[in-house]
Protein backbone atom coordinates (compact mmCIF):
# COMPACT_ATOMS: atom_id res chain seq x y z
CA UNK A 1 0.00 0.00 0.00
CA UNK A 2 1.42 3.39 -1.00
CA UNK A 3 2.49 5.94 1.60
CA UNK A 4 0.13 8.78 2.54
CA UNK A 5 1.96 12.08 2.16
CA UNK A 6 1.07 15.21 4.14
CA UNK A 7 0.77 18.41 2.12
CA UNK A 8 0.61 21.98 3.36
CA UNK A 9 -0.77 23.74 0.28
CA UNK A 10 0.05 27.32 1.21
CA UNK A 11 -0.74 30.71 -0.31
CA UNK A 12 2.94 31.67 -0.61
CA UNK A 13 4.82 28.42 0.03
CA UNK A 14 3.94 24.74 0.11
CA UNK A 15 5.58 21.87 1.95
CA UNK A 16 5.34 18.07 1.78
CA UNK A 17 6.18 15.54 4.51
CA UNK A 18 5.91 11.81 5.06
CA UNK A 19 6.07 9.38 7.97
CA UNK A 20 9.20 7.21 7.83
CA UNK A 21 9.64 4.59 10.53
CA UNK A 22 7.10 6.40 12.67
CA UNK A 23 8.96 9.73 12.36
CA UNK A 24 7.63 12.62 10.23
CA UNK A 25 10.15 13.86 7.67
CA UNK A 26 9.94 16.95 5.44
CA UNK A 27 10.82 16.09 1.84
CA UNK A 28 13.20 18.60 0.20
CA UNK A 29 12.46 19.79 -3.34
CA UNK A 30 14.91 19.25 -6.26
CA UNK A 31 16.68 22.52 -5.32
CA UNK A 32 17.25 21.14 -1.83
CA UNK A 33 14.81 23.51 -0.10
CA UNK A 34 12.24 22.26 2.40
CA UNK A 35 9.45 24.56 1.20
CA UNK A 36 8.43 25.31 -2.38
CA UNK A 37 6.99 28.66 -3.57
CA UNK A 38 3.31 28.24 -4.56
CA UNK A 39 4.02 29.87 -7.91
CA UNK A 40 3.10 28.64 -11.40
CA UNK A 41 4.27 30.21 -14.65
CA UNK A 42 3.65 29.49 -18.32
CA UNK A 43 6.35 30.16 -20.90
CA UNK A 44 5.92 29.20 -24.57
CA UNK A 45 3.61 26.31 -23.65
CA UNK A 46 5.94 25.08 -20.91
CA UNK A 47 4.87 25.06 -17.25
CA UNK A 48 7.25 26.20 -14.53
CA UNK A 49 6.54 25.52 -10.85
CA UNK A 50 8.15 26.61 -7.59
CA UNK A 51 11.58 28.23 -7.37
CA UNK A 52 12.09 28.52 -11.16
CA UNK A 53 8.66 30.10 -11.61
CA UNK A 54 9.28 32.61 -8.82
CA UNK A 55 12.73 33.56 -10.16
CA UNK A 56 11.38 34.63 -13.56
CA UNK A 57 8.22 36.34 -12.24
CA UNK A 58 9.63 39.84 -12.81
CA UNK A 59 9.98 39.34 -16.56
CA UNK A 60 7.07 36.97 -17.20
CA UNK A 61 3.52 38.37 -16.92
CA UNK A 62 2.15 34.81 -17.20
CA UNK A 63 3.14 34.06 -13.60
CA UNK A 64 0.43 33.16 -11.06
CA UNK A 65 0.96 33.74 -7.35
CA UNK A 66 -1.29 33.36 -4.27
CA UNK A 67 -3.96 31.35 -6.17
CA UNK A 68 -5.18 29.96 -2.83
CA UNK A 69 -6.92 33.30 -2.18
CA UNK A 70 -9.32 32.44 -5.03
CA UNK A 71 -10.14 28.84 -4.02
CA UNK A 72 -13.89 28.20 -3.87
CA UNK A 73 -14.74 31.15 -6.15
CA UNK A 74 -15.59 31.30 -9.85
CA UNK A 75 -12.38 33.24 -10.55
CA UNK A 76 -10.49 32.17 -13.68
CA UNK A 77 -7.07 33.22 -14.89
CA UNK A 78 -6.40 33.46 -18.64
CA UNK A 79 -2.96 32.42 -19.79
CA UNK A 80 -1.88 32.04 -23.43
CA UNK A 81 -5.51 31.97 -24.58
CA UNK A 82 -6.66 29.28 -22.11
CA UNK A 83 -8.70 29.85 -18.94
CA UNK A 84 -7.65 28.07 -15.76
CA UNK A 85 -9.63 27.62 -12.53
CA UNK A 86 -7.91 27.98 -9.12
CA UNK A 87 -8.31 24.19 -8.75
CA UNK A 88 -6.24 23.55 -11.90
CA UNK A 89 -3.45 25.93 -10.87
CA UNK A 90 -3.37 24.40 -7.37
CA UNK A 91 -3.28 20.95 -8.99
CA UNK A 92 -0.14 21.95 -10.93
CA UNK A 93 1.55 22.81 -7.60
CA UNK A 94 0.30 19.55 -6.02
CA UNK A 95 1.53 17.56 -9.03
CA UNK A 96 5.00 19.02 -8.58
CA UNK A 97 5.03 18.22 -4.83
CA UNK A 98 3.79 14.71 -5.63
CA UNK A 99 6.52 14.19 -8.26
CA UNK A 100 9.43 15.05 -5.99
CA UNK A 101 7.90 13.05 -3.12
CA UNK A 102 7.84 10.06 -5.51
CA UNK A 103 11.50 10.65 -6.45
CA UNK A 104 12.40 10.76 -2.75
CA UNK A 105 10.39 7.66 -1.78
CA UNK A 106 11.22 5.74 -4.95
CA UNK A 107 7.61 4.63 -5.40
CA UNK A 108 4.37 6.07 -6.83
CA UNK A 109 2.35 8.27 -4.46
CA UNK A 110 -1.44 8.30 -4.85
CA UNK A 111 -2.74 9.21 -1.38
CA UNK A 112 -2.49 12.45 0.57
CA UNK A 113 -3.75 14.45 3.52
CA UNK A 114 -4.03 18.12 2.49
CA UNK A 115 -4.35 20.99 4.94
CA UNK A 116 -6.63 24.03 4.63
CA UNK A 117 -7.14 27.12 6.81
CA UNK A 118 -9.55 26.30 9.64
CA UNK A 119 -11.78 29.12 8.47
CA UNK A 120 -12.17 27.72 4.93
CA UNK A 121 -15.84 27.24 4.05
CA UNK A 122 -17.35 24.23 2.31
CA UNK A 123 -16.73 25.57 -1.23
CA UNK A 124 -13.05 26.18 -0.47
CA UNK A 125 -12.62 22.70 1.05
CA UNK A 126 -14.36 21.06 -1.91
CA UNK A 127 -12.13 23.03 -4.33
CA UNK A 128 -9.02 21.81 -2.45
CA UNK A 129 -10.23 18.21 -2.68
CA UNK A 130 -10.88 18.64 -6.41
CA UNK A 131 -7.37 20.07 -6.91
CA UNK A 132 -5.95 16.93 -5.28
CA UNK A 133 -7.98 14.68 -7.58
CA UNK A 134 -6.87 16.62 -10.67
CA UNK A 135 -3.24 16.14 -9.55
CA UNK A 136 -3.81 12.37 -9.37
CA UNK A 137 -4.10 12.16 -5.59
CA UNK A 138 -6.77 10.46 -3.54
CA UNK A 139 -7.34 13.01 -0.78
CA UNK A 140 -7.76 10.81 2.29
CA UNK A 141 -8.53 13.75 4.54
CA UNK A 142 -8.79 17.54 4.50
CA UNK A 143 -7.39 18.73 7.84
CA UNK A 144 -7.32 22.22 9.35
CA UNK A 145 -3.89 23.87 9.43
CA UNK A 146 -3.89 24.86 13.14
CA UNK A 147 -5.05 21.34 14.06
CA UNK A 148 -2.21 19.84 12.01
CA UNK A 149 0.25 22.13 13.80
CA UNK A 150 -1.12 21.04 17.18
CA UNK A 151 -0.75 17.40 16.13
CA UNK A 152 2.91 17.96 15.22
CA UNK A 153 3.56 19.86 18.45
CA UNK A 154 1.65 17.60 20.84
CA UNK A 155 2.35 14.08 19.57
CA UNK A 156 5.09 13.41 22.13
CA UNK A 157 3.63 15.49 24.99
CA UNK A 158 2.52 13.59 28.08
CA UNK A 159 0.77 16.23 30.21
CA UNK A 160 -2.71 17.61 29.56
CA UNK A 161 -2.64 21.15 28.24
CA UNK A 162 -4.71 23.81 26.52
CA UNK A 163 -2.96 25.37 23.54
CA UNK A 164 -3.74 28.28 21.26
CA UNK A 165 -2.47 27.99 17.69
CA UNK A 166 -1.91 31.35 16.01
CA UNK A 167 -1.51 30.69 12.27
CA UNK A 168 -0.63 33.69 10.09
CA UNK A 169 0.29 32.46 6.63
CA UNK A 170 0.82 34.18 3.29
CA UNK A 171 -2.84 34.82 2.62
CA UNK A 172 -4.96 33.42 5.46
CA UNK A 173 -5.19 33.74 9.22
CA UNK A 174 -6.54 31.23 11.75
CA UNK A 175 -6.71 30.83 15.50
CA UNK A 176 -7.63 27.51 17.08
CA UNK A 177 -7.82 26.53 20.72
CA UNK A 178 -7.25 22.85 21.49
CA UNK A 179 -7.17 20.62 24.52
CA UNK A 180 -4.47 17.95 24.42
CA UNK A 181 -4.32 14.88 26.63
CA UNK A 182 -3.90 11.08 26.36
CA UNK A 183 -3.52 11.23 22.58
CA UNK A 184 -6.80 13.13 22.16
CA UNK A 185 -6.57 16.42 20.28
CA UNK A 186 -9.86 18.21 20.77
CA UNK A 187 -10.52 21.55 19.09
CA UNK A 188 -12.58 23.74 21.40
CA UNK A 189 -12.98 26.77 19.12
CA UNK A 190 -11.68 28.21 15.88
CA UNK A 191 -11.84 31.66 14.31
CA UNK A 192 -10.08 33.45 11.48
CA UNK A 193 -9.91 35.65 8.41
CA UNK A 194 -9.45 34.11 4.95
CA UNK A 195 -8.15 37.37 3.48
CA UNK A 196 -5.37 38.36 5.84
CA UNK A 197 -1.76 37.24 5.65
CA UNK A 198 1.85 38.00 4.77
CA UNK A 199 0.81 39.30 1.34
CA UNK A 200 -1.03 42.15 3.09
CA UNK A 201 2.11 43.06 5.06
CA UNK A 202 4.04 43.17 1.75
CA UNK A 203 1.29 45.34 0.26
CA UNK A 204 1.61 48.09 2.91
CA UNK A 205 5.32 48.38 2.08
CA UNK A 206 4.54 48.45 -1.68
CA UNK A 207 1.91 51.18 -1.18
CA UNK A 208 4.38 53.20 0.90
CA UNK A 209 7.15 52.91 -1.74
CA UNK A 210 4.73 53.81 -4.56
CA UNK A 211 3.59 56.90 -2.63
CA UNK A 212 7.16 57.98 -1.84
CA UNK A 213 8.22 57.64 -5.48
CA UNK A 214 5.12 59.48 -6.69
CA UNK A 215 5.84 62.42 -4.38
CA UNK A 216 9.47 62.56 -5.46
CA UNK A 217 9.13 62.02 -9.23
CA UNK A 218 5.43 62.36 -10.05
CA UNK A 219 5.33 58.83 -11.51
CA UNK A 220 2.85 56.16 -10.35
CA UNK A 221 4.75 52.85 -10.29
CA UNK A 222 1.56 50.89 -9.56
CA UNK A 223 0.60 51.35 -13.25
CA UNK A 224 3.77 49.56 -14.40
CA UNK A 225 3.41 45.76 -14.15
CA UNK A 226 7.13 44.99 -14.22
CA UNK A 227 7.99 47.72 -11.70
CA UNK A 228 5.22 46.41 -9.45
CA UNK A 229 6.68 42.89 -9.52
CA UNK A 230 10.11 44.29 -8.59
CA UNK A 231 8.49 46.27 -5.77
CA UNK A 232 6.74 43.11 -4.53
CA UNK A 233 10.03 41.19 -4.39
CA UNK A 234 11.76 44.11 -2.62
CA UNK A 235 8.89 44.51 -0.12
CA UNK A 236 8.91 40.80 0.76
CA UNK A 237 12.71 40.88 1.20
CA UNK A 238 12.54 44.04 3.36
CA UNK A 239 9.77 42.55 5.54
CA UNK A 240 11.87 39.42 6.17
CA UNK A 241 15.02 41.44 6.91
CA UNK A 242 13.19 43.68 9.40
CA UNK A 243 12.46 40.61 11.52
CA UNK A 244 16.18 40.46 12.29
CA UNK A 245 17.44 44.05 11.93
CA UNK A 246 15.98 47.45 12.82
CA UNK A 247 16.40 48.99 9.37
CA UNK A 248 16.97 47.85 5.80
CA UNK A 249 18.00 49.44 2.53
CA UNK A 250 15.66 49.13 -0.47
CA UNK A 251 17.52 49.71 -3.72
CA UNK A 252 15.80 49.35 -7.11
CA UNK A 253 17.91 50.90 -9.88
CA UNK A 254 16.29 51.80 -13.23
CA UNK A 255 12.78 51.30 -11.82
CA UNK A 256 11.41 53.94 -14.19
CA UNK A 257 12.44 56.81 -16.48
CA UNK A 258 11.42 60.34 -17.43
CA UNK A 259 12.60 62.91 -19.99
CA UNK A 260 15.82 63.47 -18.01
CA UNK A 261 16.73 59.78 -18.05
CA UNK A 262 16.49 56.69 -15.82
CA UNK A 263 15.09 56.91 -12.28
CA UNK A 264 16.16 54.80 -9.31
CA UNK A 265 14.35 53.96 -6.08
CA UNK A 266 16.66 54.22 -3.09
CA UNK A 267 15.25 54.36 0.42
CA UNK A 268 15.78 53.13 3.97
CA UNK A 269 12.87 51.43 5.72
CA UNK A 270 13.03 51.20 9.51
CA UNK A 271 11.30 48.55 11.59
CA UNK A 272 9.45 51.36 13.41
CA UNK A 273 8.04 52.67 10.11
CA UNK A 274 7.03 49.15 9.02
CA UNK A 275 5.28 48.60 12.36
CA UNK A 276 3.44 51.90 11.92
CA UNK A 277 2.35 50.90 8.37
CA UNK A 278 1.18 47.43 9.44
CA UNK A 279 -0.27 48.21 12.90
CA UNK A 280 -3.87 47.88 11.64
CA UNK A 281 -3.09 44.40 10.23
CA UNK A 282 -1.59 43.20 13.50
CA UNK A 283 -4.63 44.54 15.37
CA UNK A 284 -6.93 42.74 12.89
CA UNK A 285 -5.43 39.42 13.99
CA UNK A 286 -6.40 40.09 17.60
CA UNK A 287 -10.16 40.02 16.81
CA UNK A 288 -10.22 36.28 16.00
CA UNK A 289 -7.98 35.58 19.04
CA UNK A 290 -10.55 37.20 21.35
CA UNK A 291 -13.41 35.50 19.47
CA UNK A 292 -11.86 32.02 19.86
CA UNK A 293 -11.27 32.56 23.59
CA UNK A 294 -14.87 33.71 24.03
CA UNK A 295 -16.27 30.75 22.04
CA UNK A 296 -14.18 28.30 24.08
CA UNK A 297 -15.30 29.97 27.32
CA UNK A 298 -11.68 30.59 28.34
CA UNK A 299 -9.54 33.49 29.52
CA UNK A 300 -5.91 34.15 28.45
CA UNK A 301 -4.68 32.68 31.77
CA UNK A 302 -6.29 29.31 30.83
CA UNK A 303 -3.92 28.96 27.85
CA UNK A 304 -0.82 26.88 28.66
CA UNK A 305 1.05 27.34 25.37
CA UNK A 306 0.84 29.58 22.31
CA UNK A 307 2.08 27.89 19.12
CA UNK A 308 3.09 30.11 16.18
CA UNK A 309 2.52 28.84 12.65
CA UNK A 310 3.23 30.48 9.29
CA UNK A 311 6.21 32.57 8.17
CA UNK A 312 4.48 35.86 9.02
CA UNK A 313 4.62 35.03 12.76
CA UNK A 314 8.34 35.91 12.61
CA UNK A 315 7.34 39.61 12.47
CA UNK A 316 8.38 41.06 15.88
CA UNK A 317 5.24 43.27 16.14
CA UNK A 318 3.06 40.16 15.74
CA UNK A 319 4.89 38.34 18.54
CA UNK A 320 4.67 41.43 20.77
CA UNK A 321 0.90 41.76 20.18
CA UNK A 322 0.33 38.08 21.08
CA UNK A 323 2.41 38.51 24.23
CA UNK A 324 0.39 41.61 25.21
CA UNK A 325 -2.97 39.96 24.49
CA UNK A 326 -2.30 36.58 26.14
CA UNK A 327 0.27 37.54 28.75
CA UNK A 328 2.77 34.87 27.75
CA UNK A 329 5.73 34.36 25.43
CA UNK A 330 4.84 32.35 22.32
CA UNK A 331 6.44 28.88 22.17
CA UNK A 332 9.35 28.85 19.67
CA UNK A 333 9.95 25.11 19.57
CA UNK A 334 8.33 24.40 16.20
CA UNK A 335 9.37 25.46 12.69
CA UNK A 336 6.47 27.70 11.56
CA UNK A 337 7.04 26.83 7.88
CA UNK A 338 7.07 23.05 8.27
CA UNK A 339 4.90 22.19 11.27
CA UNK A 340 1.63 22.04 9.27
CA UNK A 341 2.97 19.57 6.68
CA UNK A 342 4.44 17.46 9.50
CA UNK A 343 1.02 17.38 11.21
CA UNK A 344 -0.60 16.36 7.92
CA UNK A 345 1.92 13.50 7.57
CA UNK A 346 1.09 12.36 11.13
CA UNK A 347 -2.63 12.40 10.25
CA UNK A 348 -1.72 10.30 7.19
CA UNK A 349 -0.03 7.87 9.58
CA UNK A 350 -3.16 7.78 11.77
CA UNK A 351 -5.30 6.92 8.71
CA UNK A 352 -2.81 4.28 7.51
CA UNK A 353 -2.67 2.75 11.01
CA UNK A 354 1.03 3.58 11.49
CA UNK A 355 0.30 6.00 14.35
CA UNK A 356 -1.71 4.48 17.17
CA UNK A 357 -3.68 6.03 20.05
CA UNK A 358 -4.26 9.42 18.44
CA UNK A 359 -7.78 10.80 18.19
CA UNK A 360 -8.42 14.06 16.40
CA UNK A 361 -11.65 15.90 17.15
CA UNK A 362 -12.00 18.94 14.90
CA UNK A 363 -14.84 21.44 14.61
CA UNK A 364 -16.83 23.17 11.88
CA UNK A 365 -15.68 26.82 11.69
CA UNK A 366 -18.99 28.33 10.57
CA UNK A 367 -22.65 27.69 11.42
CA UNK A 368 -24.78 25.80 8.89
CA UNK A 369 -28.47 26.13 8.20
CA UNK A 370 -31.21 26.93 5.71
CA UNK A 371 -33.24 29.93 4.63
CA UNK A 372 -36.71 30.00 6.17
CA UNK A 373 -39.71 32.28 5.73
CA UNK A 374 -38.93 35.99 5.57
CA UNK A 375 -35.35 35.43 4.39
CA UNK A 376 -34.22 34.38 7.86
CA UNK A 377 -31.15 32.14 8.35
CA UNK A 378 -32.14 29.23 10.60
CA UNK A 379 -29.05 27.46 12.00
CA UNK A 380 -29.06 23.68 12.28
CA UNK A 381 -25.42 23.23 13.25
CA UNK A 382 -23.71 25.90 15.33
CA UNK A 383 -20.10 26.87 14.65
CA UNK A 384 -17.42 25.06 16.70
CA UNK A 385 -19.49 21.84 16.72
CA UNK A 386 -17.23 18.76 16.78
CA UNK A 387 -17.18 16.93 13.45
CA UNK A 388 -18.21 14.52 12.01
CA UNK A 389 -21.74 15.40 13.07
CA UNK A 390 -25.37 15.08 11.99
CA UNK A 391 -28.37 17.23 12.92
CA UNK A 392 -32.04 17.11 11.87
CA UNK A 393 -34.91 19.57 12.21
CA UNK A 394 -38.53 19.46 11.03
CA UNK A 395 -39.90 22.27 8.88
CA UNK A 396 -43.24 22.75 7.13
CA UNK A 397 -44.76 24.53 4.13
CA UNK A 398 -45.37 28.29 4.00
CA UNK A 399 -48.43 28.23 1.67
CA UNK A 400 -51.57 26.11 1.15
CA UNK A 401 -51.27 23.24 -1.34
CA UNK A 402 -47.54 23.79 -1.74
CA UNK A 403 -46.12 20.79 -3.64
CA UNK A 404 -42.44 21.74 -3.78
CA UNK A 405 -40.05 23.09 -1.18
CA UNK A 406 -36.85 24.97 -2.07
CA UNK A 407 -34.02 24.11 0.29
CA UNK A 408 -31.44 26.93 0.33
CA UNK A 409 -28.33 25.78 2.22
CA UNK A 410 -26.14 28.45 3.83
CA UNK A 411 -23.00 28.81 5.92
CA UNK A 412 -22.22 31.83 8.12
CA UNK A 413 -23.09 33.75 11.27
CA UNK A 414 -25.39 36.57 10.10
CA UNK A 415 -29.13 36.45 11.03
CA UNK A 416 -30.40 37.11 7.47
CA UNK A 417 -29.90 34.49 4.74
CA UNK A 418 -28.78 37.04 2.12
CA UNK A 419 -25.75 38.01 4.23
CA UNK A 420 -24.37 34.47 4.45
CA UNK A 421 -22.53 32.24 1.97
CA UNK A 422 -24.80 30.12 -0.25
CA UNK A 423 -23.53 26.54 -0.38
CA UNK A 424 -26.24 25.17 -2.65
CA UNK A 425 -29.93 24.82 -3.43
CA UNK A 426 -32.14 21.83 -4.18
CA UNK A 427 -35.84 21.02 -4.35
CA UNK A 428 -38.04 18.48 -2.62
CA UNK A 429 -40.92 17.87 -5.03
CA UNK A 430 -44.21 15.90 -5.15
CA UNK A 431 -45.39 16.92 -1.67
CA UNK A 432 -49.13 16.00 -1.51
CA UNK A 433 -51.27 19.20 -1.52
CA UNK A 434 -52.26 20.16 2.03
CA UNK A 435 -52.97 23.29 4.07
CA UNK A 436 -49.87 25.26 5.09
CA UNK A 437 -48.23 23.98 8.25
CA UNK A 438 -49.45 20.38 7.78
CA UNK A 439 -46.66 18.67 5.76
CA UNK A 440 -43.67 17.66 7.84
CA UNK A 441 -40.32 18.04 6.10
CA UNK A 442 -37.25 16.77 7.92
CA UNK A 443 -33.99 18.48 6.92
CA UNK A 444 -30.79 16.66 7.95
CA UNK A 445 -27.27 18.08 7.79
CA UNK A 446 -24.23 15.77 7.86
CA UNK A 447 -20.69 17.10 8.07
CA UNK A 448 -17.97 14.54 7.40
CA UNK A 449 -14.46 14.49 8.87
CA UNK A 450 -13.21 16.68 6.00
CA UNK A 451 -15.70 19.38 6.97
CA UNK A 452 -17.68 18.76 3.76
CA UNK A 453 -21.45 19.08 3.98
CA UNK A 454 -24.19 16.65 2.85
CA UNK A 455 -27.86 17.66 3.15
CA UNK A 456 -31.06 15.54 2.98
CA UNK A 457 -34.69 16.64 2.93
CA UNK A 458 -37.45 14.09 3.55
CA UNK A 459 -41.24 14.41 3.42
CA UNK A 460 -42.27 12.37 6.48
CA UNK A 461 -45.77 11.88 5.00
CA UNK A 462 -44.62 10.10 1.83
CA UNK A 463 -41.07 9.17 2.88
CA UNK A 464 -39.87 10.79 -0.35
CA UNK A 465 -36.28 11.96 0.02
CA UNK A 466 -33.97 14.30 -1.85
CA UNK A 467 -30.29 14.79 -0.99
CA UNK A 468 -27.23 16.65 -2.20
CA UNK A 469 -23.56 16.76 -1.42
CA UNK A 470 -22.93 20.45 -1.50
CA UNK A 471 -21.33 21.66 -4.70
CA UNK A 472 -20.83 25.41 -4.63
CA UNK A 473 -21.63 27.58 -7.64
CA UNK A 474 -17.89 27.57 -8.31
CA UNK A 475 -17.68 23.78 -7.84
CA UNK A 476 -16.58 21.55 -10.69
CA UNK A 477 -18.79 18.89 -12.22
CA UNK A 478 -17.52 15.30 -12.40
CA UNK A 479 -17.00 15.70 -16.20
CA UNK A 480 -14.89 18.84 -15.65
CA UNK A 481 -12.80 17.09 -13.00
CA UNK A 482 -12.24 14.08 -15.27
CA UNK A 483 -11.25 16.39 -18.17
CA UNK A 484 -8.83 18.25 -15.89
CA UNK A 485 -7.35 14.98 -14.56
CA UNK A 486 -6.75 13.89 -18.17
CA UNK A 487 -5.16 17.25 -19.07
CA UNK A 488 -2.99 17.15 -15.94
CA UNK A 489 -1.79 13.64 -16.84
CA UNK A 490 -1.04 14.76 -20.41
CA UNK A 491 0.85 17.79 -19.12
CA UNK A 492 2.80 15.62 -16.69
CA UNK A 493 3.67 13.34 -19.63
CA UNK A 494 4.70 16.38 -21.71
CA UNK A 495 6.83 17.65 -18.81
CA UNK A 496 8.44 14.21 -18.47
CA UNK A 497 9.22 14.12 -22.21
CA UNK A 498 10.64 17.64 -22.05
CA UNK A 499 12.90 16.59 -19.17
CA UNK A 500 13.97 13.43 -21.04
CA UNK A 501 14.72 15.49 -24.16
CA UNK A 502 16.87 17.92 -22.14
CA UNK A 503 18.76 15.01 -20.56
CA UNK A 504 19.25 13.38 -23.98
CA UNK A 505 20.64 16.65 -25.42
CA UNK A 506 23.04 16.95 -22.47
CA UNK A 507 24.21 13.35 -22.91
CA UNK A 508 24.67 13.90 -26.67
CA UNK A 509 26.68 17.09 -26.02
CA UNK A 510 28.84 15.23 -23.54
CA UNK A 511 29.37 12.39 -26.02
CA UNK A 512 30.48 14.84 -28.76
CA UNK A 513 32.99 16.34 -26.32
CA UNK A 514 34.41 12.97 -25.15
CA UNK A 515 34.56 11.69 -28.76
CA UNK A 516 36.65 14.69 -29.85
CA UNK A 517 38.99 14.01 -26.91
CA UNK A 518 39.19 10.27 -27.73
CA UNK A 519 39.90 10.93 -31.44
CA UNK A 520 42.89 13.11 -30.51
CA UNK A 521 44.23 10.34 -28.26
CA UNK A 522 43.89 7.57 -30.90
CA UNK A 523 45.46 9.56 -33.74
CA UNK A 524 48.04 7.36 -35.43
CA UNK A 525 47.27 4.47 -33.08
CA UNK A 526 44.31 2.90 -34.93
CA UNK A 527 43.27 2.48 -38.54
CA UNK A 528 42.58 5.84 -40.29
CA UNK A 529 39.27 4.50 -41.71
CA UNK A 530 38.01 3.80 -38.18
CA UNK A 531 38.84 7.38 -37.09
CA UNK A 532 37.10 8.80 -40.19
CA UNK A 533 33.99 6.73 -39.43
CA UNK A 534 33.87 8.09 -35.86
CA UNK A 535 34.46 11.65 -37.13
CA UNK A 536 31.49 11.37 -39.52
CA UNK A 537 29.19 9.91 -36.84
CA UNK A 538 30.19 12.74 -34.46
CA UNK A 539 29.45 15.41 -37.10
CA UNK A 540 26.08 13.75 -37.82
CA UNK A 541 25.19 13.93 -34.11
CA UNK A 542 26.25 17.59 -34.00
CA UNK A 543 23.98 18.35 -36.98
CA UNK A 544 21.06 16.50 -35.31
CA UNK A 545 21.62 18.58 -32.14
CA UNK A 546 21.45 21.79 -34.18
CA UNK A 547 18.17 20.68 -35.80
CA UNK A 548 16.85 19.70 -32.35
CA UNK A 549 15.15 16.57 -33.71
CA UNK A 550 14.92 14.35 -30.61
CA UNK A 551 14.42 11.02 -32.44
CA UNK A 552 17.32 11.80 -34.77
CA UNK A 553 19.54 12.82 -31.81
CA UNK A 554 18.72 9.52 -30.10
CA UNK A 555 19.58 7.47 -33.25
CA UNK A 556 22.80 9.35 -34.03
CA UNK A 557 23.87 9.22 -30.37
CA UNK A 558 23.42 5.43 -30.26
CA UNK A 559 25.33 5.05 -33.55
CA UNK A 560 28.24 7.19 -32.31
CA UNK A 561 28.29 5.37 -28.97
CA UNK A 562 28.64 2.06 -30.81
CA UNK A 563 31.56 3.35 -32.95
CA UNK A 564 33.36 4.97 -29.99
CA UNK A 565 32.95 1.75 -28.02
CA UNK A 566 34.55 -0.28 -30.86
CA UNK A 567 37.38 2.26 -31.07
CA UNK A 568 37.96 2.07 -27.33
CA UNK A 569 38.03 -1.75 -27.47
CA UNK A 570 40.62 -1.67 -30.32
CA UNK A 571 42.67 0.91 -28.47
CA UNK A 572 42.54 -1.20 -25.33
CA UNK A 573 43.51 -4.36 -27.25
CA UNK A 574 46.45 -2.53 -28.84
CA UNK A 575 47.59 -1.21 -25.48
CA UNK A 576 47.31 -4.71 -24.01
CA UNK A 577 49.42 -6.20 -26.89
CA UNK A 578 52.06 -3.51 -26.43
CA UNK A 579 52.21 -4.13 -22.69
CA UNK A 580 52.53 -7.88 -23.33
CA UNK A 581 55.33 -7.37 -25.83
CA UNK A 582 57.19 -5.11 -23.42
CA UNK A 583 56.76 -7.65 -20.66
CA UNK A 584 58.15 -10.44 -22.83
CA UNK A 585 61.08 -8.28 -23.92
CA UNK A 586 61.76 -7.44 -20.29
CA UNK A 587 61.63 -11.11 -19.27
CA UNK A 588 64.11 -12.12 -22.05
CA UNK A 589 66.60 -9.41 -21.00
CA UNK A 590 66.42 -10.55 -17.42
CA UNK A 591 67.26 -14.14 -18.44
CA UNK A 592 70.40 -13.04 -20.37
CA UNK A 593 71.53 -10.98 -17.45
CA UNK A 594 71.21 -14.02 -15.18
CA UNK A 595 73.94 -15.89 -17.15
CA UNK A 596 76.64 -13.40 -16.06
CA UNK A 597 75.72 -13.39 -12.40
CA UNK A 598 78.46 -14.60 -9.98
CA UNK A 599 77.59 -15.77 -6.49
CA UNK A 600 79.67 -13.81 -4.02
CA UNK A 601 81.20 -15.33 -0.91
CA UNK A 602 81.46 -13.31 2.26
CA UNK A 603 82.74 -13.77 5.76
CA UNK A 604 81.17 -12.26 8.86
CA UNK A 605 83.59 -10.21 10.93
CA UNK A 606 82.70 -9.38 14.51
CA UNK A 607 84.01 -6.16 16.01
CA UNK A 608 85.38 -6.77 19.51
CA UNK A 609 84.66 -3.76 21.64
Swiss-Prot record:
Recorded protein name is: Chaperone protein DnaK
Q: Name one GO molecular function term.
A: ATP-dependent protein folding chaperone
Q: Where is the secretion signal located?
A: none
Which InterPro entries does the protein's record reference?
ATPase_NBD, Chaperone_DnaK, Heat_shock_70_CS, HSP70_C_sf, HSP70_peptide-bd_sf, Hsp_70_fam
* CDD domains assigned: ASKHA_NBD_HSP70_DnaK-like (cd10234)
Q: Which portions of this protein are annotated as coiled-coil regions? A: none
So what family is this one in? Answer: Belongs to the heat shock protein 70 family.
- Provide this UniProt record's keywords sorted from A to Z: ATP-binding, Chaperone, Nucleotide-binding, Phosphoprotein, Stress response
Q: What induces it?
A: By stress conditions e.g. heat shock.
**Phosphothreonine is carried by which residues?**
172
> Does the entry feature the keyword ATP-binding, yes or no?
yes
Q: What does this protein do?
A: Acts as a chaperone.
Bias category Acidic residues: which stretches?
A: 597-609
Tell me the segments the record calls region Disordered. Answer: 578-609
A Pfam family hit: HSP70
